[in-house]
Amino acid sequence: MTLAKVFSQKLRELGISSIYIGHERPSLQSLAIKMLLKNYGLVEERREGMLITQDHGIKLISGKGTETSRYTFRKGGKKVSIHLPEYPKMVIDLGLFEFLNEEEKEKTLLQVDLCLSVIRKFLWDGNLTVVGKADYVLGRANIVQSLSLSDEDNPVILDPYGDVVATDQILRDHNVFVIGGIVDKGRRLDRATERLALSRGYSFPRVKIQLRGSIIGVPDEINKILEIILRVKELDQSLEEAIISLQSKSDKISRLLHDVQLYGMEVLEEEARWLRADDKVIEIVRSRLGKN
């Protein structure tokens, strides 16, 4: 359950159906994050404004208008006590970080940094854990040296060479997702997640995310893997839709090249529509195949 949904349920319990938000971003998720991490909350005062949006049944009002609210969201306001979602827990394990060269370390930490903004789209910092780098600071995410999990956590580790193929249901049924702080596909340290799992003694399932039977075209950035999982679990998107939505142009090109080489040029247009690839991507694919 997203933080926005938890927040909206608590507001309704308190009899609050609308909030005047001033210049704040019109999103309950954004308001809840700001309330948790900064000195913001609700002040009981009557304000009039224009209905900007209705988010999870709560009216968000701003500017001038005829809509009324008894509560204003602002700095110094009273915080609303909400039950923070314990699951899902997203874990990034940096156990192989010291084996990376400097360029790889820089890219890895950039992707991990981006995970904070991703987790805040759905949950909050407390649902993110970084393992194996004691001097690392990432908002209010949990920074630990080793991971302690129970059977109730029902964990899996994401590995492009794992023996379990991810499905929508598998992702929705599990509570904890471990992502290795390194990219496996075609990089210097091949099958690094398998190596990480062995070194850590992780005995739980190694799950691979595929797109119609292949890992080609599946984004491999840590932050995007995390968001794919959260879109399936928290927004009820299909796994395929989440993958395609987060593909870069490079991901689309790689998949189109793979499929055209496998099935022939006649599939290019249909595959491009499936991947929502634009004309520029199709042009690049044709050029690389010498078909211009």
Curated annotation (Swiss-Prot):
GO terms for cellular component: cytoplasm. One of its GO terms (molecular function) is tRNA (adenine(9)-N1)-methyltransferase activity. It comes from Sulfolobus acidocaldarius (strain ATCC 33909 / DSM 639 / JCM 8929 / NBRC 15157 / NCIMB 11770). Belongs to the class IV-like SAM-binding methyltransferase superfamily. TRM10 family. Keywords: Cytoplasm, Methyltransferase, S-adenosyl-L-methionine, Transferase, tRNA processing. It is an enzyme of class 2 (transferase). It is found in: Cytoplasm. The keyword Aminoacyl-tRNA synthetase does not apply. Its EC number is 2.1.1.218. It comes from the Archaea. It catalyses: adenosine(9) in tRNA + S-adenosyl-L-methionine = N(1)-methyladenosine(9) in tRNA + S-adenosyl-L-homocysteine + H(+). Transmembrane segments: none annotated. One of its GO terms (biological process) is tRNA processing. This is tRNA (adenine(9)-N1)-methyltransferase. Catalyzes the S-adenosyl-L-methionine-dependent formation of N(1)-methyladenine at position 9 (m1A9) in tRNA. Residues 72-253 form the SAM-dependent MTase TRM10-type domain. The keyword Methyltransferase applies. Its main location: cytoplasm. InterPro entries: MT_TRM10-typ, MT_TRM10-typ_sf, TRM10_methyltransferase, tRNA_m1G_mtfrase_arc.
